[in-house]
Amino acid sequence: TLAIEQARAAKIAFSPPMTEIEATYAVPKDSKITKVAEVDAPGIRISVPEKAGYELYLTRTIKNATLIKSKGTPAAVELFTKKGADALGGLRPALLDTLPQMPDARLLEGNFMTVNHGLGTPRAGRTGAGADYLKAFVDEMVASGFIARSIEKNGVKGLAAVAPKKP
């Protein structure tokens, strides 16, 4: 699956979304920050890996906090755990996986954005049949509950199936 992004949509014909994943923050356990909205405050330093979809979103939307961009997730985690950043931005599943390396951290409830994922086919030189097929396939997989069951069966934390469309 691919993150459905406007920048990619020029070259990729996306299916409807199948799943969504939350982006949130890790903060030190003793932080006074208890809500996602409290992170965008003067003096708060947010560590994020550069060029991640959520980093691009935060670059557009953060008004008061300072983003500190690192080359990759390991560097962003190190900046948070060893160099005193006030928050670490990331996708909830990745942050959950990283929590054992960050024993003095906790995740905030809620999210600052969600990322929808779907299937895609190249736009260039296509007749649209592939995109039409993907749309029908994804609609059926979501409506039948297959996506939700697969997420549950495989124990994927932080990932959710999108709600089926109402007829």
List PLM regions with ranges:
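Short active-site oxyanion
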Residues: 42-46, 85, 136-137
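Ligand-binding clefts/hinges and TM-proximal coupling segments of bilobed small-molecule sensing domains
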Residues: 53-70, 107-108, 138-167
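A ligand-binding cleft/hinge motif common to bilobed small-molecule-binding domains
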Residues: 1-11, 56-60, 81-113
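Solvent-exposed, polar/charged alpha-helical surfaces in well-ordered, non-transmembrane soluble domains
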Residues: 37, 56-60, 74-82, 93-97, ...
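Acidic, polar ligand-binding/catalytic clefts
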Residues: 1-38, 106-112
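Periplasmic-binding protein-like
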Residues: 19-27, 92, 96-139, 157-167
